[in-house]
Structures are given as C-alpha cells and as structure tokens.
Amino acid sequence: RDLHSFPTRRSSDLNADGGDPMLCQEQKIWGYETPDGAFAQFTRVQAQQLVVKPKHLSWEQAGCYMLVLATAFRMLYGHPPHTLQPAMNVLVWGGSGGLGSMAIQLIKAAGSNAIAVVSTEERGKWCMEIGARAYINRTKFNCWGQLPSTKDRAAYGAYLKEVQRFGKAIWEITGKGIDPDIVFEHPGEQTFPVSAYVCRRGGMVVFCAGTTGFNLTFDAAYVWMRQKRLQGSHFATLMQADAANHSVMDGRVLPCMSEVFEFDAIPKAHDLMWKNQQRSDRKSVV
C-alpha cells in the first residue's frame, strides 16, 4: 500500500510549521509522487509514518484500510467550513469501493446520511449493511461522461433532463428539494458534471481522484450562481490519519477486507480490479 511521507526537515513553507502539512511543497506521497514506492515485500519507513495497529485486527486487516480511510477522513473533515456535521446528506460515489466504504462508515458515525451510488443491487445492499441510509443504482441513468456543449440545445437539454431525473432519485431519499450537502467525488470525468449540478447551494463537491479520467467538465453557471465549492483533497495529515485510525480502534469503522492475496497473486488482483470484477471492499496482499 502507499505510505505517507512527511517532511523530515524544517521548511520555509509556513504550511509545514503549524499550517496544513499537506500543502507543504516538500510533501509527497511515497510511490505516487516519488519514483520508488512501497510496493514490495519489505520496506523501511520512518517513525512518523507509523500509526498504532488496532489490537483486535489481524495484520492483513490492519494493512488494508489506512490509505482509503485517511483520504476519506480528510475529504469529510479537512476543508472547513464544509466539514461533516450531524444530519447532513452526503452523496458517495462508488459506495462499495475502498473510499466509498470508508466514507459511508464515517458519515454514519457522525450521525449523517450517506447515499451510496453503485453499479449493482448487490453492492447497494452491502452499502446499506455498513451504514448507508440508501443507495442509487447508477446503471438506471444515462447522464455520464463529459458535459455536452451548452450551445447544443438538443443534446444539452436531453442530458439535463436525465441529470434532473437522477436528482429526483436523491430527493426520494432526502425529501423534495433537499440536495446533498457534500458530494464525495473520485470517479472524475464520468461523474463530475452530475456532482456539480446535484450538490446543494453553498455545498461542496470534494474530490481526491479521477479514476475514470482527469478531464473534468461542469456547467459553471450552476456553480457560481449557486455558490458551490469544488475542493481538491489529497490523502491526509498525520493528525487526520491518527484520528481516522482511532475510529477503527474504537470499532466505529470496520476495515471491510474481503480477500487476501499471496504476493505472487498480485497480477490476478490487478486484473480483477481492472475488469471491475472484484468483490466489494478492501484487499490485502501478504
């Protein structure tokens, strides 16, 4: 798994000295923003890269959740004033995946409502089991991909009707006219235009990835006139990771590990993910 590498020397960047360490220019994710990573049987790490292992978990369980949990924690709590509060409604893309399953549990623990977006009924029911208030099967809608040209009235009009139909599916859960306070985004290209539209006035679309593509499009008018916030988010600070880990130690968040692969089966695990045939939740490689 990726490990978080914190700066080891004093920096002139104020964000490293009492500000947000994730905004420090020296901050890099080991193996993602550096040439060499931790994808090996053995790696040597620094003391500040470690968090306490929950005593009730196996090593496999303990090794499978931190990347997605800490990322989800920062997305939901790291960008004030748009932080998770009780009774909020949060739309969670990919609810049965790594980020989504962690987000659902954090949202549930906060007394808020997670609405999972999934691709099958089976995955939706699993999201309900871990704490989602409800789920929406995205295969019942056809509003995915880049935003059609707003100058093409026919194409844009048809697209907007479908997005509004998706929005009404949200209202069936939250109540008429009640849009998500936060949209938990990571697919990117295929879903971002919809996220920017369905988020409530003054709400936030927070995203940490572009798993379906990096070319994000949206109708700017709905963002500026309704004063919505589009917020990028990248992993987590040590403090945020520690706080997230305590939610596991306290039993409020489960690691959700479904399969364990031997090290030589890594190609199989990657193939399953590439084909979207993996079981819901986390994997662990030993």
Regions found by a protein language model. Give the residues of each.
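Rossmann-fold dehydrogenase core element
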Residues: R201-C208, F218-M257
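Hydrophobic/small residue at the entry helix of a nucleotide-binding pocket
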Residues: T71, G98-L99, Q190-T191
